[in-house]
Amino acid sequence: MKKILLALFLVSSVLAFSARVVKSTELTFKNEIVYVGQEKVPYTGVVESYDEKGVLTAKAEFKDGKMNGASKIYYPNGKLGSEATFKADVQVGVQKDYYESGKLKAEVPYKNGKVDGTAKAYDENGKVIEQVTFKNGQQVK
C-alpha cells in the first residue's frame, strides 16, 4: 500500500510541476479561444502577465483555451490584490479582493458567471462596512 501511495504521489508531483507557463504576450485569440502563437491546439497551462518593469501583475490557469481554475491579480509591490475562480471562462465561487496591506477588502460570491449571494466589503480592520445580497446577478431588496 505504501508503494502505491508513493507512486501516486510521485506521478502527481511530476504532473503538477510540468504545467506549461507562458507570458500573456505570447497568446493569440481565435473565436474566444486562447492559443499560444500559431499553435493549432487550444492552450492548457498557466498564463502570466508582467508590467514594463518585469513585475508579475496577473496569473491565470487555462484549460482547452479557456480560463479554468485560479486567476490572481497582483499589486505592483507583489502582494495579492484579487483572486477568483473560473470554469470554462465562467466565474464561479467567491472572488476575494485585498487591500495592499494584504487584509481582506471584499468577498463577492459568483454562480454561473453572475453575482449570487451576499457580497461583503470590509474596512482595513476587518469590520464589515457593507453587505449586499444578489440573486442571479440582480440585487435583492
Description of each model-found segment:
Residues 14-141:
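Glycine/tyrosine- and acidic-biased, solvent-exposed loop/turn segments at the edges of beta-strands
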